Design a protein with these regions (language model features):
Chain A
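N-terminal export/assembly segments and adjacent metallocofactor-ligating motifs
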Residues: 1-281, 289, 313, 319, ...
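Domain-level signature for respiratory redox metalloenzymes
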Residues: 62, 141, 145, 199-206, ...
């Protein structure tokens, strides 16, 4: 038998064996590729050039790819729009690629429409549902097909347009909440040219901005941000001066040398006040133009009158006018805050007039109108489809909602990140109207509010997995075109929308098949560019074609003799007694209209002015807050005549008294766990109103009231590192 | 007598334990999802190591061949062999083969295969016996002395940060 000593010996030996017998290396796995991606070198990175589609600015990107996985997105140094720079939203494109909530298989409705309940299905079945619907429609009533997309450029717009035209439906609508309608209308009125100008900020000596947050949002924030840096620091003897007018201290306004707060919607009046002083003091190069403007009514825009309308000191208007005229070349630009009023065109025309008066059109450091379509002349009438004007399409969307209710459409094809069910004013009831369309097919990567209302969702790849081309709306002098190529193999079982349309056209036959005679979208692009003499291999290596020789800019016929913009006052909905505060909404730097809200990198990006993350807030002037008994961090219900939403108060000294500012972008009900249930949606407060001059959505057109409320959770603001920031100290 | 028997029992159980533990560890290292035979490929068919370990000339890692590369030949060669059938199954399912790692250097060393291979060092210098075995084994222990002996003999860098970067 074992005695105690033996038991201990045996026990010790067992422990030794167990410890050291098992102390060998645990085998690690080496998992090779099944099929290696082309040109893969283990542990070595490859860089692929493409273009960003996180916003419509169209920056060039290069993506670091290691062993078939995209690791980092950077700006393309060769691309004229961003010259190697890239913003946070572009960087976050990787998260869209790897997002766990991406749609990976076609989805078929498995509950009632709008319930958001879907079941996965095969591509064969999904495409047969699509084709059965299209074939039925083609035979009976082709004009009852609706295609509602985000604004598209390049050949994917060409494919969509040709498909709809050959199918026989005129109902092709592109919706963009931040369309440039007012800018186009203003330039048509002042310069006689309906186009987005090129602002040569880098070479300007003086910059006036009227609610134009060009450094954070707007047409091309990366391009203008870089140019702004050059304006301030790249010339040894000149540091350009920057003056910002607006109702809110945005990040752009905070960068200005002088920030002059003005009443919402009075940007046009402020610009004309400056113009008045320039003409009165004979500070303009063209006396004839000045005289005709003076006679047309500019004489009435005295600094005193303008001061009353805007809240500016007449002496500030005089001083800015003298500086602007004395520091040529200068630029006056106006942005979304001014364009989104019911007098948006008037506001933007005021800024345009200042450029014309100061003789800044067509000169270095001023504004110009490049001929961006010069390279595509061989497309004839189709050339305009490659770079359509960046309009909002608001009038068409409103019209389409009416038609949905009347039953005009029997089928709708939806695509894009502008998410109309989220980004249209709530009183329009877009979602409700969409439910009355018998068949709705969405092309989407994520189940946002709009895609959730469809009965078939076809998954599309993200921009990092796509073939394509693009022409940036601003930031280059001419025919610079970008090439998109897949930087990785598609992660999910997705197909590009143009590929689906081309395949559908082939099945439909006849005129539709003849209009899209390609095997796929890649072939369409390659044939088209080969026909233009573009070296595709070089273009894909460089990320596009960037000609060194600038095509001659277009001439602005009325630049020498501009006409005076027709004065218009901004209108605001809501009884001032019940709704005492003006509502100023602005696109969030991280989420824009809300499309970035599903990416956690963007959710945790602190807002540059308030440092808030993950939630919604409302900026309130300290005096207003005191009157209402509100403190920083309090929960409030923001109510307009059209709806209400919850938000946290951020007491901010640079918000004009009587104005509250709300960022757009949060307030999703769907769109994944990162986006949903993070406060209210400011679009739900907005009226269905448009800028009278251009038809653009007028977001700055309602008053609101604030009422204290107890909200769950709190607003998280990151630590401020710039030192003391308490408003008590600077008031 | 009783005492000696007890001692023998003790020694036997100790040995059994050690053997069991050791065998378990050894089998985990030498067993692979597919019994790939290095000897047949390298000696009988005279294939260059770099045909399969194709990134040895280009990158730090020599690389493990993709399933696709196996199937280039084994679509037609030895298709009835039970081990080849396993590869065909991986290929059919489009799944990678989960090989067990045999040779590994610690994280604090940098060993660029391409430097050695392009300098003309034969693979067998560091991987001796690989041409004689079927499933890969590591016969040579990669101690710093082993590396330095060769570096000194060839008059190449023995700076610390040549390898410890």
């Amino acid at each position: 038998m074992l005695d105690r000593r033996d038991f201990l010996k045996l026990g010790g030996a067992t422990a030794f064996a167990a410890l050291f017998g098992g102390c060998d290396r645990i085998p690690k796995k080496i998992i090779p590729f099944v099929i290696p991606p082309e040109n893969t070198a283990l542990g070595e990175s490859l860089w692929y050039a493409s273009a960003c589609r996180q916003c419509p600015a169209g920056c060039g990107i290069v993506v670091r790819v290691s062993e078939g996985r995209a690791k980092k997105i950077e700006g393309n140094p060769l691309h004229p729009v961003n010259r190697g720079k890239l913003c946070a939203r572009g960087q976050a494109g990787l998260q869209a690629l790897y997002h766990p909530e991406r749609i990976g298989r076609p989805l078929k409705l498995s509950g009632p429409r709008g319930s958001g309940k879907f079941a996965e299905t095969s591509w064969e079945e999904a495409l047969s549902i699509l084709l059965t619907g299209l074939k039925k429609l083609q035979a009976a009533a082709p004009a009852s097909l609706l295609m509602l997309t985000e604004p598209m450029r390049g050949h994917r717009n060409l494919v969509a347009a040709r498909f709809m035209r050959a199918f026989g439906s005129p109902h092709r609508i592109a919706w963009d909440p931040f369309g440039q309608d007012a800018l186009l209308a203003a330039n048509e009125a002042v310069f006689g040219i309906r186009d987005v100008p090129e602002y040569d900020i880098a070479n300007a000596r003086y910059l006036l901005s009227f609610s134009g947050d060009f450094l954070e949002t707007g047409i091309s924030p990366v391009h203008y941000g870089r140019a702004y840096g050059q304006m301030r620091q790249s010339r040894p003897t000149v540091r350009g001066k920057f003056v910002h007018f607006g109702p809110r201290l945005s990040m752009t306004a905070a960068n200005a040398d002088v920030f002059l707060p003005i009443a919402p919607g009075s940007e046009g009046a402020a610009a004309l006040g400056i113009a008045h002083v320039m003409v009165r003091e004979k500070l303009t190069p063209s006396a004839a133009a000045a005289a005709s403007l003076w006679a047309a009514g500019l004489s009435r825009m005295t600094p005193e009158a303008v001061g009353k309308a805007t809240g500016l000191l007449p002496s500030d208007i005089e001083a800015v006018a003298h500086e602007f005229a004395g520091n040529a070349p200068g630029i006056a630009m106006a942005g979304d805050g001014a364009a989104g009023c019911t007098n948006g065109t008037y506001n933007l025309a005021g800024a345009a007039l200042l450029n014309a008066l100061a003789g800044n059109v067509g000169r270095q450091g001023g504004i110009s109108f490049p001929n961006r379509l010069a390279a595509f002349s061989r497309f004839g009438a189709d050339a305009a489809l490659l770079l359509p004007p960046p309009e909002s399409g608001f009038a068409s969307v409103r019209d389409s909602v009416e038609k949905m209710r009347k039953g005009t459409y029997r089928m709708a094809l939806l695509s894009g990140s502008t998410n109309p069910a989220f980004s249209l004013p709530a009183p329009l009831k877009f979602g409700e109207a969409l439910l009355s369309v018998p068949q709705v097919v969405s092309f989407a990567s994520f189940l946002d509010e709009t895609a959730s209302l469809s009965d078939l969702v076809l998954p599309v790849p993200t921009f990092l997995e796509e073939w394509g081309d693009d022409i940036a709306p601003a930031g280059h002098a001419g025919d610079a075109l970008s090439m998109l190529q897949p930087v990785v193999d598609p992660f999910r079982d997705t197909r590009q929308m143009p590929d689906i349309l081309i395949a559908a056209a082939r099945e439909l036959g006849g005129a539709v098949a003849a209009a899209l005679p390609w095997a796929g979208f890649r072939e369409c692009l390659e044939k088209s560019y080969a026909g233009m003499g573009v070296n595709l291999e070089a273009a894909r290596r460089d990320g596009g074609v960037f000609p060194g020789k600038t095509p001659a800019p277009r001439t602005a016929p009325k630049a020498q003799r501009p006409s005076l913009p027709v004065a218009a006052e901004a209108e605001f909905e809501g009884d001032p007694a019940r709704y005492p505060l003006f509502l100023h909404v602005y696109p969030s730097i991280a989420h824009s209209d809300g499309r970035g809200a599903n990416l956690s990198w963007l959710q945790e990006l602190p807002d540059p002015v308030t440092t808030a993350v993950w939630r919604n807030w409302v900026e309130v002037n300290p005096k207003t807050a005191e009157t209402l008994g509100l403190a920083d961090g309090d929960g409030v219900v923001v109510a307009s005549p059209f709806g209400s939403m919850e938000a946290f108060v951020v007491v901010h000294p640079a918000t004009a008294p009587g104005v509250v500012a709300l960022p757009l972008g949060q307030g999703h009900t769907r769109y994944g766990t990162n986006a949903a249930n993070r406060g209210g949606n400011p679009f739900s407060l907005l009226p269905v109103k448009a800028d009278r001059g251009s038809g653009a959505p007028a977001r700055q057109s309602t008053r609101v009231s604030l009422a204290k409320a107890k909200l769950a959770g709190s607003l998280v603001r990151t630590v401020n590192v710039e030192g003391q920031w308490k408003y008590e100290n600077i008031l | 007598m009783l005492r000696r028997r007890r001692q023998a029992a003790l020694v036997a159980s100790l040995l059994a334990l050690l053997l069991l533990g050791g065998a378990a560890a050894a089998s985990a290292l030498t067993s692979q999802p597919i019994r790939y035979n290095h000897n047949v490929h390298v000696v009988a068919y005279k294939m260059d190591c770099r045909f399969c370990h194709s990134s040895a000339m280009k990158t730090a890692s020599a690389g493990i061949p993709s399933v696709e590369k196996c199937m280039i030949c084994h679509r037609v060669i030895a298709v009835d062999h039970p081990e080849i059938k396993k590869i065909a199954q991986y290929w059919k399912e489009k799944k990678p083969i989960p090989w067990n790692r045999v040779t590994e250097l610690p994280d604090y060393t940098y060993f660029p295969h391409f430097r050695m291979v392009n300098a003309g060092i034969a693979c067998l210098t560091c991987h001796p016996g690989m041409d004689k075995v079927d499933v890969a084994v590591q016969e040579q222990e990669f101690t710093m002395g082993f590396c330095l002996k060769c570096h000194k003999a060839r008059g190449v860098s023995i700076e610390c940060w040549s390898c410890h970067i």
